[in-house]
Amino acid sequence: HGEAVSIGICLAFKLSNSLGFCCQDDVQRVENLFEKFHLPTSLVNFKNLSLSSKEMIERFRFDKKSKQNQLTFILNKGIGKSFIHNNINIDDLIQFLDKEL
């Protein structure tokens, strides 16, 4: 579970950066912290993952934060500056996930 949490936090920072909410330095600081404790920081660490970006998005719909088929993400404007974002363009999300897989 801890590995999934570390990957999720790193992906949230990467997505936040790709959407213009936080800087690359924050992404790097978060990744460096998790790497210091030998925790994974990306999906690339899981070569056997056979989900496409669209399949991942369908699984996101089952997350406890998602309501009425609307995806909800906790994104970041910087370290310690998280916020709820539930208006992500699906095409942007697919493009982001395709890059991360």
Question: What residue ranges belong to the model's regions?
Answer:
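Short glycine/serine- and small hydrophobic-enriched flexible loop segments
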Residues: C10-S18
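Active-site metal-coordination segments of metallo-dependent hydrolases
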Residues: H1-E3, L19-Q24
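C-terminal charged capping/lid subdomain of soluble metabolic enzymes
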Residues: F21-L101
